[in-house]
């Protein structure tokens, strides 16, 4: 990566980065072809053209779900009787270990703003919000300044570039809840309500913010739109090495690697390339024990999966999810029970409490893991954990919080079951075996 010079043709998201890593403000952004796509769209395209272009490009959501962006846009209500529609940028990046959206907002904020302008034009939207994670203080300052710059240059406001297109953009900082990454919880929070997910249908495209048609897209997703509009579908598709997904993606590795970071790479780049060529391998004296492909809420994979292409289908076939594609390396000296317990504490604390399986199941999982960590577990603890994974699986709760929370647990048991079984207390096992009278059925045959 260090020997590769990013260009507009190969690195559409990051080629404008400064060598000193300072923010690219509007004057420099305009000198680097900034807002060219907006001018092209407003002068030569209609909104339907932009929607069709994005659909043909194959752009998929970069927040983790990987849903087709063009298809999502086409689901927006076609009823033009209501002139109020909203575009929301999901910048509530609270996935542990993930920092790609912050990277884009702090370094190239106008790329996101231009992407929102193009998306708003395509969707006939005149008002947008950036819902920003509250802890991103630096990004908040940069985005506020950048929005004002765009207003001063006439890119935000009324009759933009004499096209008749109007757009207002507001920045909203969240109060710090993981669940706000779920789009309907985000909408509730923006309305001033408790951030609980909503029942679907109706979907936000029909009944969203304040009951109006609303589209919610991720920061990185929106940041891809300007280059697609400027350079076209065929160029964008050829960027990828994958047959599954088009374009490039911000990918990275964290953990005890020599060079943790994030890089823009073509879809289809293998995890091994990212770990060894970009993150420069594990630190001295350590080797890779396991890894999560895209955030704390994705299943663990092991060393044999490193040669898989990083795209949505290949990682799913291996039993995990691409997620945010910011991977975490787990070294051989890390206790899997302690690691998973830490992850589950986070998800338990961040549960909104609306669904019983999630509200009660996650704290129960934490208690069992704490017991196993102290070597004080009961004989059936591992089986109970597996049963809880099923009870919190997709379809059992209102949103994807609980299913995501149990993904690291179920995969850790799958690959490192002996570590979990080693947490069962031998003393308790013997004590139970010696009880005469009332005792659990599991020990009856041994008495």
Swiss-Prot record:
SMART domains: NADH_4Fe-4S (SM00928). It catalyses: a quinone + NADH + 5 H(+)(in) = a quinol + NAD(+) + 4 H(+)(out). Pfam families: Complex1_51K, NADH_4Fe-4S. Binds 1 [4Fe-4S] cluster. The keyword Flavoprotein applies. One of its GO terms (molecular function) is metal ion binding. It comes from the Bacteria. NAD(+) binds at residues 61-70. Gene3D superfamilies: 3.10.20.600, 6.10.250.1450, NADH-ubiquinone oxidoreductase 51kDa subunit, NADH-ubiquinone oxidoreductase 51kDa subunit, iron-sulphur binding domain. Keywords: 4Fe-4S, Flavoprotein, FMN, Iron, Iron-sulfur, Metal-binding, NAD, Quinone, Translocase. FMN binds at residues 174-221. Its EC number is 7.1.1.-. [4Fe-4S] cluster binds at residues 352, 355, 358, 399. Its cofactor is [4Fe-4S] cluster; FMN. InterPro entries: NADH-UbQ_OxRdtase_51kDa_CS, NADH-UbQ_OxRdtase_suF, Nuo51_FMN-bd, Nuo51_FMN-bd_sf, Nuop51_4Fe4S-bd, Nuop51_4Fe4S-bd_sf. Composed of 13 different subunits. Subunits NuoCD, E, F, and G constitute the peripheral sector of the complex. Belongs to the complex I 51 kDa subunit family. NDH-1 shuttles electrons from NADH, via FMN and iron-sulfur (Fe-S) centers, to quinones in the respiratory chain. Couples the redox reaction to proton translocation (for every two electrons transferred, four hydrogen ions are translocated across the cytoplasmic membrane), and thus conserves the redox energy in a proton gradient. PANTHER family: NADH-QUINONE OXIDOREDUCTASE SUBUNIT F. This is NADH-quinone oxidoreductase subunit F. It comes from Buchnera aphidicola subsp. Schizaphis graminum (strain Sg). The gene is nuoF.
């Amino acid at each position: 990566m260090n020997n590769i010079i990013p260009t507009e043709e190969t690195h559409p998201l990051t080629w404008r980065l400064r060598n000193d890593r300072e923010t690219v403000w509007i004057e420099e952004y305009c000198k680097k072809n900034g807002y060219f796509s907006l001018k092209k769209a407003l002068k030569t395209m209609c909104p339907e053209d932009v929607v069709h272009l994005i659909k043909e490009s194959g752009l998929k959501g970069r927040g983790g779900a990987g849903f087709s962006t063009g298809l999502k846009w086409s689901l927006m209500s076609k009823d033009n009787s209501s002139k109020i529609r909203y575009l929301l940028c999901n910048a509530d990046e609270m996935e542990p270990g993930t920092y790609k959206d912050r990277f884009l907002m702090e370094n190239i904020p106008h790329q996101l703003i231009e992407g929102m302008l193009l998306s708003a034009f395509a969707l006939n939207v005149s008002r947008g919000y950036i819902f920003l994670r509250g802890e991103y203080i630096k990004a908040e300052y940069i985005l506020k300044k950048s929005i004002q710059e765009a207003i001063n240059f006439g890119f935000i406001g009324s009759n933009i570039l004499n096209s008749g297109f109007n757009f207002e953009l507001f920045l909203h900082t969240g109060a710090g809840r993981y669940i706000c990454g779920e789009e309907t919880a985000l909408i509730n929070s923006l309305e001033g309500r408790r951030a609980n997910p909503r029942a679907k249908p109706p979907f936000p495209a029909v009944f969203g913010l304040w009951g109006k048609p609303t589209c919610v897209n991720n920061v990185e997703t929106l940041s891809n739109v300007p280059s697609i509009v400027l350079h076209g579908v065929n160029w964008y598709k050829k960027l990828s090495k994958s047959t599954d997904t088009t374009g490039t993606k911000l990918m990275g590795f964290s953990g005890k690697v020599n060079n943790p970071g994030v890089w823009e790479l073509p879809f289809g780049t293998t995890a091994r390339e990212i770990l060894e060529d970009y993150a420069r391998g594990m630190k001295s004296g350590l080797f890779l024990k396991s890894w999560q492909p895209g955030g704390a809420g994705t299943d663990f994979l092991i060393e044999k999966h490193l040669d898989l292409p990083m795209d949505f289908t290949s990682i799913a076939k291996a039993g995990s999810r691409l997620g945010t594609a910011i991977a975490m390396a787990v070294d051989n000296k890390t206790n899997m029970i302690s690691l998973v317990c830490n992850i589950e504490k986070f998800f338990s604390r961040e549960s909104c409490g609306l669904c019983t399986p999630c509200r009660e199941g996650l704290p129960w999982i934490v208690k069992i893991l704490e017991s196993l960590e102290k070597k004080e577990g009961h004989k059936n603890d591992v089986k109970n954990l597996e049963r809880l994974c099923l009870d919190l699986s997709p379809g059992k709760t209102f949103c994807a919080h609980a299913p995501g929370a149990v993904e690291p647990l179920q995969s850790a048991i799958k690959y490192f079951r002996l570590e979990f079984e080693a947490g069962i207390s031998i003393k308790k096992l013997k004590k139970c075996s010696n009880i005469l009278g009332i005792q659990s059925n599991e020990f009856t045959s041994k008495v």
